Amino acid sequence: GLPVCGETCFGGRCNTPGCTCSYPICTRN
């Protein structure tokens, strides 16, 4: 949901475990 994973997902996916792409950033549920 809210916390940002410190990662962008312009490629469409996030490398950080537990993070999902909320374009253009990765967020943690």
From Swiss-Prot:
The keyword Thylakoid does not apply. Disulfide bonds join 5-19, 9-21, 14-26. InterPro entries: Cyclotide, Cyclotide_sf. There is a cross-link at residues 1-29 (Cyclopeptide (Gly-Asn)). This is a cyclic peptide. Pfam families: Cyclotide. GO terms for biological process: defense response. Keywords: Disulfide bond, Knottin, Plant defense. The presence of a 'disulfide through disulfide knot' structurally defines this protein as a knottin. Probably participates in a plant defense mechanism. Has moderate levels of cytotoxic activity, active against a human lymphoma cell line with an IC(50) of >30 uM. Belongs to the cyclotide family. Moebius subfamily. This is Cyclotide vibi-D. It comes from Viola biflora (Yellow wood violet).
